[in-house]
């Protein structure tokens, strides 16, 4: 099993916070450090500072050495495909070819309203995502003069410099909850499909369906990596699990909910003691998951990163 550490940077994480997390994840043996791409702070206290994902990744590219870096995921609505192509090629060069590019349709209407971004219906955003991915591939890999004319975007004569360092292109991750359209988009454009909010049982069912969609489209299912974004909270004993659970609830402004919030999520989280965490990770592996993005809601707790590395990455 391969592991990435994924943080929700909109929890008020400064650049210094994210650098500390990325370096700690690198030292702990994680393959990849991923961060969300949001412009508003949530859940919990509104108004906390949020940082731009690609500005942060550019900095991390120069201040880490081994760990891969990326977004999970960048909404199609935030950036024109030409702008995203330039950003990703630049960060790939700055990192020496350590970039993963996670993209999705976006979902949080409030942050779009707060920053003046249009937020069309999901069907339109999905169309935009398909066009964005075609343009990314074309600008990264196509010849000078490559052109595209779609419903939402036009590129009359493409030319991108620098090109990405990774050949033929940085890996693309398409994320979602396993809808038919997200699977079709992943099969057409992605190197990896990332399933969110799924139990091991649902993951097995969705991955099997994804393989069928790939075969029907004439693609070898083995060429499309299966991964899952999985909430992660681990403690050395039950007392430490309880302490970290309370810290998450406090940060989310949900202390009054007690254990109910975690009880609802435990069937799809890596949660508990080291033995419980390893057992749940094994269930995801048996479901066909090749990489787990450990979604860490404790970005101020660097010892939690150490423990996740000890128990899962190196365990």
Where are these regions (language model features)?
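Active-site-adjacent structural elements that line small-molecule/cofactor binding pockets in enzymes
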Residues: 1-315
């Amino acid at each position: 099993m391969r592991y990435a550490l994924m943080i929700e940077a909109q929890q008020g994480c400064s650049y210094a916070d994210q650098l500390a997390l990325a370096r700690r994840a690198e030292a702990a043996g994680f393959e990849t450090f991923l961060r969300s791409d949001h412009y508003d702070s949530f859940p919990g206290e509104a108004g906390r500072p949020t940082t731009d994902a690609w500005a942060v990744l550019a900095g991390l590219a120069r201040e880490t050495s081994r760990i891969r870096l990326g977004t999970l995921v960048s909404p199609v609505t935030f950036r024109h495909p030409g702008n995203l192509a330039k950003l990703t090629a630049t960060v790939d060069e700055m990192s020496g070819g350590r970039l993963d590019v996670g993209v999705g349709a976006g979902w949080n209407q409030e942050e779009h309203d707060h920053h003046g971004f249009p937020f069309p219906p999901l069907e339109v955003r999905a169309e935009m995502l398909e066009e964005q991915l075609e343009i990314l591939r074309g600008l990264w890999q196509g010849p000078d003069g490559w052109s595209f004319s779609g419903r939402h975007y036009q590129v009359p004569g493409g030319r991108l410099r620098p090109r990405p360092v990774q050949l033929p292109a940085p890996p693309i991750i398409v994320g979602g909850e396993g809808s038919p359209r997200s699977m079709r988009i992943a099969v057409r454009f992605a190197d990896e499909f990332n399933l969110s909010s799924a139990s091991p049982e649902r993951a097995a069912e969705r991955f099997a369906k994804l393989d069928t969609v790939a075969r029907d489209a004439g693609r070898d299912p083995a060429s499309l990596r299966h991964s899952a974004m999985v909430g992660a909270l681990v403690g050395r004993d039950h007392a430490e699990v309880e302490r970290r659970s309370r810290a998450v609830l406090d940060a989310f402004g949900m202390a009054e909910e007690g254990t109910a919030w975690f009880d609802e999520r435990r069937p799809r989280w890596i949660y508990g003691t080291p033995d419980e965490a390893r057992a749940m990770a094994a269930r995801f592996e048996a479901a066909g998951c090749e990489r787990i993005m450990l979604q860490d809601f404790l970005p101020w707790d660097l010892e939690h990163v150490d423990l996740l590395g000890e128990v899962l990455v190196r365990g």
